[in-house]
Amino acid sequence: MAPALSPTRSHHVAVIGAGPAGLVAARELRREGHSVVVFEKQKQVGGTWIYTDEVESDPLSVDPTRSVVHSSVYRSLRINGTRECTGYRDFPFVVRSGVSRDPRRFPSHGEVLAYLKDFAKEFGIEEMVRFETEVVKVSPAAEEGIGKWRIESTEKEKKVRRDEIYDAVVVCNGHYVEPRLAQIPGISSWPGKEMHSHNYRIPEPFRDKVVVLIGNSSSAEDISRDIARVAKEVHVACRSNPADTFIKQTGYNNLWTHSMIESVHEDGSVVYQNGKTISVDIIMHCTGYKYHFPFLDTNGIVTVDDNRVGPLYKDVFPPAFAPWLSFIGIPWQVLPFPMFELQSKWIAGVLSGRIPLPSKEDMMIEIKTFYSTLEVQGIPKRYTHRMGNTQFEYYNWLASQCGCSETEEWRKEMCLANGVRKEAHPETYRDEWDDHHLVSEAYQDFSLYS
């Protein structure tokens, strides 16, 4: 066991990002008695949930000199998980009155942003936030003592650069900014337009076009249907589909699902593994994102290798820097907000000395064992942080560390049922459901916090 910190000791902690992870991190750290400064590049809280019509100058978002747009939200986006499962555990995402509020069970991105602002207001988070302040560099400040961190930041308006020392840093900068792209044979000579879904906002630019989307994510499903309203043809290609896949989507006369692209050619054609050849105007990569920490300088100790952030104990602490450096929100295929809350409680309690960590050696042994297990199971490195149905074991482990209750059974059942419904009825799952008994259980729990 690592030496325990002084019980209930207060530390000066920097939180990077005022999105849904950073907001709840700030609350939990302050609740535990720490002093907190939150660094946020934008003018308001909300992170990726702040919608903007603006897109990047490079539609693929690979040009390092581009002006980066943080949000990946498109105008028609509605959440793909239920309202009940989406909210923080002790601040339910319930319907609120107001002319601009969205009362639907699967509301729009604007309703999520409004909820996050409600949360920030309720817990006085904004007083801890430095808005329009970008973190330029985070590095160990060994000369200042064990666990100290130097943060260099710039304020947009004042053009002031600060150099400050903190006891600990919690990284909450999200991972929906730096796109991953599919590797397509022949793409360098293909004459059409390529883009990433990060830069998709509205369907109108695709009117009368033949469009290919690559990916099987929720964004690929939603955007393909959004575009199909105006496009000439929409084709969705997916690596996980069998090679002979060619399916016309029910309810559409211009939307097909294919196997993966085999190659593209100078004449504008796209050849699929199923043997189909189609002349295409636009290829959109709906292929996810890379973890990206451009400000973090750990001298190679914390790395991103094929989308594995490591080494991280329980997806949060790099052993060499624990507990003074931590990450919130690394796992995916999860219930994000409740997970952020539990990770935040754990970090806050570890920093105060209330919750012990294993020794650095024991943490590294567990990490290496986990990596070996993934390798034996044939799981690619890029899926290291994918959880899916194992997420609930993780939440309950976090809860056990923090001394709080495990994930509610209704939340687990609702999440799993929604996944089944989404798979079976992708067109209607947001507006038709049959889990009213679980909704009732959820609202009985919510009454404890009203």
From Swiss-Prot:
NADP(+) binds at residues 215-220. It holds the Pfam family FMO-like. Its cofactor is FAD. It comes from the Eukaryota. One of its GO terms (molecular function) is N,N-dimethylaniline monooxygenase activity. Its EC number is 1.8.-.-. Keywords: FAD, Flavoprotein, Monooxygenase, NADP, Oxidoreductase. InterPro entries: FAD/NAD-bd_sf, Flavin_mOase, Flavin_mOase-like, FMO-like. FAD binds at residues 17-22. Catalyzes the conversion of methylthioalkyl glucosinolates of any chain length into methylsulfinylalkyl glucosinolates. Belongs to the FMO family. This is Flavin-containing monooxygenase FMO GS-OX-like 3. It comes from Arabidopsis thaliana (Mouse-ear cress).
